[in-house]
């Protein structure tokens, strides 16, 4: 199953479609991996979160790949309108599995080429 890897770098965010997601299975939020897995040779990326096929966000303090209903007072998965409000919301565990369709990452160390050059983004604007 194809999934999306969102790579954030300072002010710019790029989205990469990856066909083979098996290489990222088992990574936990906070783990670093080689960007060559997603086509960014020379880059080191850090997993910061993600979402599963039903849109439930990954939460760092929920171990494993399971989906639970957690009582939240704010933070990832729930943003109350007033202070002190708690609500039970469904969140996903912190480990990447087959059900995850979006993985959010941040650049830890950059490669020699810019991400836009590797992906070919921005070429359409220059041609027009």
UniProtKB/Swiss-Prot annotation:
Instruction: Tell me the disulfide pairings in this chain.
Output: none
One annotated Gene Ontology cellular component of this protein: ribonucleoprotein complex
Span-the-membrane segments of this chain are: none
Q: Which domain of life is it from?
A: Archaea
Sorted alphabetically, which Pfam families does this protein's record hold? Ribosomal_S6e
Sorted alphabetically, the Gene Ontology BP terms of this entry are: translation
Question: Which keywords fit this entry according to its UniProt record?
Answer: Ribonucleoprotein, Ribosomal protein
GO molecular function: any one? structural constituent of ribosome
Which family does the record claim for this protein? Belongs to the eukaryotic ribosomal protein eS6 family.
Descriptive protein name: Small ribosomal subunit protein eS6
């Amino acid at each position: 199953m194809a999934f999306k890897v969102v790579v954030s770098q300072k002010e710019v965010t790029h989205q990469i479609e990856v066909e083979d997601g098996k290489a990222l299975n088992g990574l936990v939020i906070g783990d670093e991996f080689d960007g060559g897995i997603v086509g960014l040779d020379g880059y080191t990326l850090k997993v910061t979160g993600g979402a599963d096929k039903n849109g439930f966000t990954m939460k760092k303090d929920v171990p494993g790949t399971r989906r639970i209903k957690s009582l939240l007072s704010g933070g990832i998965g729930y943003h109350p309108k007033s202070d002190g409000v708690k609500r039970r919301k469904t969140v996903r565990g912190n480990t990447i599995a087959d059900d995850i369709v979006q993985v959010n990452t941040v650049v830890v160390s950059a490669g020699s080429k810019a991400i836009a050059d590797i992906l070919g983004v921005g070429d359409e604007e220059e041609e027009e």
